[in-house]
């Protein structure tokens, strides 16, 4: 079984990858997307989104990281795929699933699910540019407005030479609304000879088991669930006990220390509030604490609330 951390734009940055890989036995982490338009991007763009490239493409805990690209022009995607590999990325992934309106309006992400030939051309160009020993992968949804082109898109990725395919079991229009339609993944997994990775609505170990039973996949990708329950991958792979609220609060304080000592400290209030929006699903205590700290705007005020909460737990 493989468990892969999904790319989540604006959520799973290098610090979050560091934190989560330090407490989970992830097999692979995928970055937020690098936006490719019409040129070969400078190294600094890749290093900003994936500073792990400076350490051989690994997090401090030794988990490999794969750069994800988002774009619509095959040759530019190919050039930038090769650059990612040269910089140390463990393979390169193509994003055909992002549902964000701003991205779709500029012909990126899930909007390309309406054009299987374009998907094929992009993956084909990337595969031809990247040496065979390096994986070229793709992530798709079930479709854009409907699921009518789902199998055609999956075949386009495979026939273009992709190493494996991750599928988020919802369409663009579905967004993130439950349920996830895992049964569609089953059809592709039975038809394609390459590994298929199942993604969508995996919030706990039982969800992971059901997803693998329905799809027949032995690889899963987790995103929002991994932020909601920080040690989700560990519970899935080893049967570890899910983190208690005390465990999670301590992890948040560890995250806080790293955030404030790094380059992103100005963004801390927004980042920590965003994390609380995911934790609310798993921990009632998170909702209570968020109601207290949401009125604060400064880092100092928020850190004080978190430290007070931990102090009360330890009494």
UniProtKB/Swiss-Prot annotation:
Q: What is its EC number?
A: 1.3.1.-
Catalytic activities: 5,6-dihydrouridine(16) in tRNA + NADP(+) = uridine(16) in tRNA + NADPH + H(+); 5,6-dihydrouridine(16) in tRNA + NAD(+) = uridine(16) in tRNA + NADH + H(+)
- Cofactor entry: FMN
Give the top-rank taxon of the lineage listed in the UniProt record for this protein.
Bacteria
Question: What is the active site of this protein?
Answer: 98
Locate the transmembrane regions by residue number: none
Cite the InterPro entries for this sequence.
Aldolase_TIM, DUS-like_FMN-bd, DUS_fam, DusC, DusC_C
Q: Which key words tag this protein in UniProt?
A: Flavoprotein, FMN, NADP, Oxidoreductase, RNA-binding, tRNA processing, tRNA-binding
Question: What residues correspond to the site Interacts with tRNA?
Answer: 35, 95, 176, 271, 273, 278, 294
GO molecular function term, any single one: FMN binding
Which residues are FMN-binding? 7-9, 68, 139, 199-201, 223-224
Q: Which cysteines are joined by disulfide bonds?
A: none
Role this protein plays:
Catalyzes the synthesis of 5,6-dihydrouridine (D), a modified base found in the D-loop of most tRNAs, via the reduction of the C5-C6 double bond in target uridines. Specifically modifies U16 in tRNAs.
Q: What is the similarity comment for this entry?
A: Belongs to the Dus family. DusC subfamily.
Q: What is this protein called?
A: tRNA-dihydrouridine(16) synthase
């Amino acid at each position: 079984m493989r468990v892969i951390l999904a790319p989540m734009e604006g959520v799973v940055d290098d610090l979050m990858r560091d934190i989560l890989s330090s407490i989970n036995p992830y097999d692979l982490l995928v970055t937020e997307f690098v936006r490719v338009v019409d040129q070969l991007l400078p190294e600094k763009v890749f290093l900003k989104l994936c500073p792990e490239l400076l350490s051989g493409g690994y997090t401090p805990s030794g988990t490999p990281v794969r750069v994800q690209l988002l774009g619509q022009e095959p040759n530019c995607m190919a050039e930038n795929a090769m650059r990612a590999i040269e910089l140390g990325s463990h393979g390169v992934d193509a994003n055909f699933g992002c549902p964000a309106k701003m991205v779709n309006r500029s012909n990126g992400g899930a909007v390309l699910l309406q054009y299987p030939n374009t998907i094929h051309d992009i993956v084909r160009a990337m595969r031809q540019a990247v040496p065979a020993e390096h994986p070229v992968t793709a992530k798709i949804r079930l479709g854009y407005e409907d699921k009518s082109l789902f199998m055609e898109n999956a075949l386009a990725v495979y026939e273009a030479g992709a190493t494996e395919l991750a599928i988020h079991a919802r369409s663009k229009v579905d967004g993130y609304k439950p349920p996830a339609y895992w049964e569609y993944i089953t059809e592709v997994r039975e038809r394609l000879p390459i590994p298929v990775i199942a993604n969508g609505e995996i919030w706990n170990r039982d969800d992971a088991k059901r997803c693998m039973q329905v799809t027949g996949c032995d690889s899963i990708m987790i995103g929002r669930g991994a932020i909601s329950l920080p040690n989700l991958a560990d519970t899935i792979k080893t049967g570890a006990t899910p983190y208690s609220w005390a465990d999670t609060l301590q992890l948040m304080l560890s995250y806080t220390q790293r955030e404030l000592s790094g380059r992103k400290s100005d963004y801390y209030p927004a980042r920590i509030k965003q994390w609380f929006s995911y934790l609310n699903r798993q921990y009632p205590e998170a909702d209570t604490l968020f109601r207290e700290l949401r009125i604060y705007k400064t880092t100092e005020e928020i850190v004080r609330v978190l430290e007070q909460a931990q102090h009360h737990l330890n009494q």
